[in-house]
């Protein structure tokens, strides 16, 4: 759990779908450009879960740019309470998901130290400097923290 009503994971397998059903999800935010598999689309339809897809190509090269406009749009979707409870995922739940969650943490006014600690906890030995630079440079828009987007009592982590 990232925050109440906001979850993260790697790509859910078929065996994970039963657990996902227990979360009462309204939305799944998929951060990859590939088509969602038919088996999963059937599950989403059966459960009334909407698929929000923001296709971010994996950034394995050190100088590949993360598309800020796409991540901003994805962040707006995460912050929209009508989409919650929401699951954010990419293929591994490390890099693309980590960047989006890192941007959310900036909206929540977490310190960079805490944001990077969380990012590295999920990315492990595969942490990417380019992702951390993206998070560091990201400036939340005034609209991102609009009233009602997240509960008023946001924890500020040191």
PLM region spans:
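Cys-dependent protein tyrosine phosphatase-like superfamily
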Residues: 1-88, 92, 99-158
């Amino acid at each position: 759990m990232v925050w109440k009503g906001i979850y993260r994971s790697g790509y859910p397998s078929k065996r994970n779908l039963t657990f996902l059903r227990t979360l009462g999800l309204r939305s799944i935010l998929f951060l990859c450009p590939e088509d969602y598999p038919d088996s999963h689309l059937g599950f989403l339809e059966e459960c009334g879960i909407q698929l929000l897809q923001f296709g971010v190509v994996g950034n394995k090269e050190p100088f590949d740019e993360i598309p800020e406009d796409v991540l901003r749009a994805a962040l707006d979707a995460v912050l929209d309470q009508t989409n919650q409870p929401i699951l954010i995922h990419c293929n591994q739940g490390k890099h693309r998901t980590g960047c989006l969650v890192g941007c959310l943490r900036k909206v929540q006014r977490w310190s960079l130290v805490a944001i990077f600690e969380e990012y590295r906890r999920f990315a492990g030995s595969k942490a990417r400097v380019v992702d951390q630079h993206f998070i560091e440079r990201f400036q939340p828009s005034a609209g991102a923290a609009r009233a009602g987007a997240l509960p008023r009592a946001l924890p500020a982590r040191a």
